[in-house]
């Protein structure tokens, strides 16, 4: 039997936010390995939108798809499911190995851009 889609029952905003955390975790400018948790990544320096979008590496994300980055309830829900941990200063998150591996099905949030 194929794996269940969204086995933790995340809502759309939680899925979008986790997708963005996963993308940030892949960028050297925003992430580093977590010293205390094998397979986890510390994400810092969350991007700030300008206008209706923000840049994520070579990609662009619509601001409307990133509201969860500033929503404490979303962070709490993702932490409760074991996908992230909040730590240190505001705007710092540890994406757990489970969070990095979770299939959100929302990779289309990231659009390639030339500017």
Tell where the protein language model's regions lie, with residue ranges.
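A short, conserved structural fragment
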Residues: 79-89
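Generic N-terminal initiation segments characterized by hydrophobic and/or small/turn-forming residues
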Residues: 43, 53, 75, 97, ...
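Short, amphipathic alpha-helical interaction segments positioned at domain boundaries
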Residues: 3, 80, 98-115
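Short, amphipathic alpha-helical interface elements at domain boundaries
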Residues: 2-67
């Amino acid at each position: 039997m194929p794996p269940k889609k969204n086995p933790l029952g995340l809502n759309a905003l939680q899925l979008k936010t986790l997708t963005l955390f996963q993308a940030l975790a892949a960028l050297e400018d925003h992430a580093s390995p977590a010293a205390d948790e094998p397979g986890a990544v510390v994400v810092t320096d969350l991007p700030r939108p300008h206008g209706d979008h923000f840049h994520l590496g070579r990609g662009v994300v619509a601001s409307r798809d990133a509201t969860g980055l500033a929503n404490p309830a979303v962070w709490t829900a993702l932490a409760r499911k074991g996908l992230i941990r909040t730590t240190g200063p505001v705007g710092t998150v540890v994406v757990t190995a489970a969070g990095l591996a979770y299939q959100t099905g929302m990779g289309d949030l990231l659009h390639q851009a030339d500017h």
